Regions:
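Active-site rim/adjacent substrate-binding subdomains
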Residues: 1-130, 135-166
Length: 166
């Protein structure tokens, strides 16, 4: 298990456009393995390569069934609907905002061996696909919210969500 340091907001690599992966080799496999280990250790639901200082189009997403999906050279090919909800980021610790994303997202990507595939999901996983792919283009979720929640506002938002679900 190899954990990588998570890059924080303000560091240059989070604002750069990542280059596509062209070599599907052992270095890529090590990166993906390390990213999965780092994601699981962090308690997050997604991690993009620039968040560990690597400017390549690679990300990992943990879906709502706790499966980790590896996405190499991902692109969003279809969206449907809209959802608005709370979002945070491992590279922006302690900060949360309300962000609107598509409800359903289909992604075309390659696996660690270069094989193309498509994956479609909704809700939190769809939100995560969008969030992580934006990292590959040098963007952070804070660009989509005009207000970062204070700790008090965050707790109030969570309380209201729980009441709505009850």
């Amino acid at each position: 298990m190899a954990l990588r340091r998570i890059v924080l907001q303000g560091e240059d690599c989070l604002t750069k456009v990542c280059r596509p992966v062209t070599d599907f080799d052992n270095r890529l496999h090590i990166l993906l393995n390390d990213m999965k280990d780092t994601l699981l250790d962090s308690g997050g639901v997604g991690l993009a390569a620039p968040q560990v200082g690597i400017l390549r189009r690679v990300c990992v997403v943990q879906n709502e069934n706790d499966e980790i999906i590896e996405l190499v050279n991902p692109e969003i090919v279809y969206t449907q609907g809209e959802q608005t909800g709370l979002e945070g980021c491992l590279s922006v610790p302690g900060k949360f905002g309300v962000v609107t994303r598509p409800e359903v997202v289909r992604v075309r990507a390659q696996d660690r061996d270069g094989n193309f595939f498509e994956v479609e999901d909704s809700d939190l996983t769809a939100r995560c696909f969008c969030h992580e792919i934006e990292h590959l283009d040098g963007h952070l979720f804070v660009e989509h919210t005009d207000h970062l929640l204070t700790e008090e506002e965050l707790q109030e938002y969570i309380r209201r969500q729980e009441e709505d679900e009850a």
